[in-house]
C-alpha cells in the first residue's frame, strides 16, 4: 500500500477516513526543504525552501482508495500534481506520495479550510512553528484564534473539503 504525506485537510482523521476508508494513519512526519504556502485558490501547498520543513501526517493508503484521494485533490483538473518524496516519520525516512498545488501563491487561505487544518495540526500536536505558521494564515483569513485541544489522541477536526488543492512549486 502506498504511503501518503498529508499537510492540509487530509490530516483530519475523520475526513480522511470518509474519503479513504482503508487508510491508516502512521503518525507525524515531515517533508524537508519545503515550506507551507497558500496558493491563489486559498489552499495549502508545500513550496521548496531549503531552510524549511513541512510537518504533517503519514498515511498508509490502500490502492483501492488512491482514486478517491486523487479526485479529492483534483489531480485530473491539474489543481494538484503528485510526486514521490522522501519524508521523515517517527520510524525513520520513507518515500511517500505528496500532492503539490499547481498555482503558487501568494494567496489568502479559505477561512473554513484553514480553521480545519489548524485544528487537525493541533490534534496531532505538530511543532509550535507549524502551528504558528498556520495561525498566521488563519489570522490573514479572518479566523478567530482558539485554544488548542487538551491532550489525548488526535481527534477529528471540522469537516472541511476544499474546492481546490495546493500550489505546485515550479522551479
Predicted segment positions?
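Glycine-aromatic micro-motifs
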Residues: 1-171
Amino acid at each position: 500500500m502506498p504511503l501518503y504525506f498529508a499537510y492540509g485537510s487530509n490530516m483530519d482523521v475523520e475526513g480522511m477516513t470518509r474519503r479513504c476508508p482503508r487508510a491508516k494513519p502512521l503518525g507525524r512526519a515531515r517533508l524537508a526543504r519545503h515550506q507551507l504556502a497558500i496558493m491563489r485558490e486559498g489552499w495549502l501547498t508545500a513550496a521548496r525552501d531549503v531552510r524549511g520543513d513541512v510537518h504533517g501526517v503519514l498515511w498508509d493508503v490502500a490502492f483501492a482508495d488512491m482514486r478517491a484521494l486523487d479526485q479529492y485533490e483534483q489531480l485530473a483538473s491539474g489543481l494538484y500534481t503528485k510526486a514521490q518524496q522522501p519524508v521523515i516519520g517517527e520510524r525513520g525516512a520513507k518515500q511517500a506520495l505528496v500532492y503539490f498545488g499547481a498555482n503558487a501563491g501568494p494567496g489568502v487561505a479559505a477561512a473554513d479550510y484553514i480553521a480545519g487544518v489548524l485544528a487537525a495540526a493541533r490534534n496531532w500536536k505538530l511543532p509550535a512553528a507549524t502551528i504558528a505558521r498556520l495561525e498566521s494564515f488563519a489570522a490573514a483569513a479572518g479566523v478567530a484564534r482558539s485554544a488548542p485541544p487538551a491532550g489525548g489522541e488526535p481527534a477529528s477536526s471540522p469537516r472541511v473539503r476544499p474546492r481546490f488543492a495546493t500550489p505546485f512549486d515550479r522551479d
